[in-house]
Amino acid sequence: MKKHVISAGLLSLSLVASIFAHDLFLKTDSFFLKPNSKFTVRVMNGTFLESEGAVTFARLSDVSVVSGGNRVHPKEADLSKDETTAFLNLTTGAAGTYVIGLSTKSREIALKAADFNEYLKEDGLPDTLEERRKTGELEEDAKERYAKHVKA
């Protein structure tokens, strides 16, 4: 019984930690919008609760709004920002379901060997960590290429 309680506690902590991970989120004040109305989507770069840095339009590889089989690409003028948060200022059309998607251009970061190995452990990539161990690469620094993709 004690093992189950400890396991449940660890699982809960890992789920909470994943919510507060550094990532990209789209947030609106409401998911129920009137037709032909203006609304703002906050582009949160950090956690779901707090944005740590505004994404610039130049950093985006794609911004799409899809509804009724049509895809629209908002322009740079539709994006505003303050120090920590970017805002997509959009207008709905006819009543229906809308999907907003956003992708950033890929970036590359250099990581020291120990930091990269820890990252692989934390992100649940044991196969990659084991491959580094088998090939004798545990002491080699690494580069990670990443991009962020989000939809709402």
Predicted regions span which residues?
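Basic/polar N-terminal segments that are highly enriched at the extreme N-terminus
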Residues: M1-K2, I19-A21
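N-terminal soluble domains immediately following signal/targeting peptides that reside
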Residues: H22-A152
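Bacterial N-terminal signal peptides
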Residues: A8-S18
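Bacterial N-terminal signal peptides that target proteins for export
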Residues: M1-G9
